């Protein structure tokens, strides 16, 4: 579906599912491979509130908007390609790599950040993108 440009939105566990694999100690579990990265489980919890500026137009927002949320995970992504496109620049939180979060490829968006949808138009924008793509 990702290669056909259908909208895919994923947070945290969904992000992990869209990677090539999840490595857990000596075990490796194959995932979907939408993103050319590997998830590696860690012993240490990453728990933060998050605040980000949207750096690129994406499925849920136009660029320059501010997004709030949180992250809560025991994993990190390994071998993130240098040319990866990220939707968010974090001022608070860790994200995927170098305070960047929201991996983008085709019409897929996946992040460690759990976005707070309560007082925003992000859900509406996502639904509009889904409707637009359902009419193709």
Short names for language-model regions:
Residues 1-59:
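Cysteine-nucleophile active-site neighborhood
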């Amino acid at each position: 579906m990702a290669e056909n440009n259908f909208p895919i939105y994923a947070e945290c566990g969904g992000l992990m599912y869209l990677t090539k694999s999840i490595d857990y100690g000596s075990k490796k579990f194959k995932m979907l491979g939408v993103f050319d990265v590997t998830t590696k489980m860690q012993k240490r919890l990453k728990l933060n509130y998050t605040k980000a500026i949207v750096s690129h137009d994406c499925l849920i927002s136009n660029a320059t908007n501010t997004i709030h949320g949180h992250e809560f995970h025991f994993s990190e992504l390994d071998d993130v390609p240098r040319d990866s496109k990220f939707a968010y620049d974090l001022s608070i939180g860790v994200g995927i790599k170098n305070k960047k979060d929201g991996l983008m490829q085709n019409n897929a968006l996946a992040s460690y950040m759990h976005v707070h949808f309560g007082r925003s138009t992000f859900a509406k924008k996502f639904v509009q993108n889904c409707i637009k793509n359902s009419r193709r």
